[in-house]
Amino acid sequence: MPDFIWEGNINTSICDQLLNYYDNCTIVPKLSFQASPTQEMVEGHFRGHGKTSTDLHLHMILSHNEGCLKYYFDELSRCITEYMEEYTWSGGMESVISDGFNIQRYQPGEGYTLWHYERTNGELSKRFLAWMTYLTDNPDGGTEWLHQEKYVAGKKG
C-alpha cells in the first residue's frame, strides 16, 4: 500500500547530544509514564500492552539557550524541506514544528507496543506530518503502522 511515511535522518552526533541533555537535564523533571495496558488480536497474534517510558516533556523555547535543541530543530527543518521536495504536492502547505515535544527513554522490556494509527479529531485532521527520531539503535524496536503495512526499524538518527 502506498504511504507517505518517510525515513529521513539527522546527524547522529545530535542524537548523542540529546541523550546527554536528557541524562543531565535538571530544569525539567523526568516523568514515568505508563499507559493503560491493553492487548489486541491481530492476524492470530496478540499485539501490545501499552506504553511504558520515562519522558522529558520540553518546550521549543528551550532551544534558545540549549545548543543541542537548536541543532536538533535545525535538522528537523532540513528534514521537512527534504520531505516536501520528495512529496511535491505538500510544498504549498504551511509547515510548523510543534512547540511541545518529548524525549522518551525506554528501559529493557519497556516501549510503545501498540499499533500506530491516527485518532482523528478536528485538530489532528489538519496535521499531515508527524515526526519521530530514534536517538539510539534498537534492533528489537521500531515503529509499525498496521494499515499502511509499514515497519521502520529503530535506527539511530
Task: Identify the residue ranges that each predicted region occupies.
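Fe(II)/2-oxoglutarate oxygenase catalytic core
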Residues: M1-K156
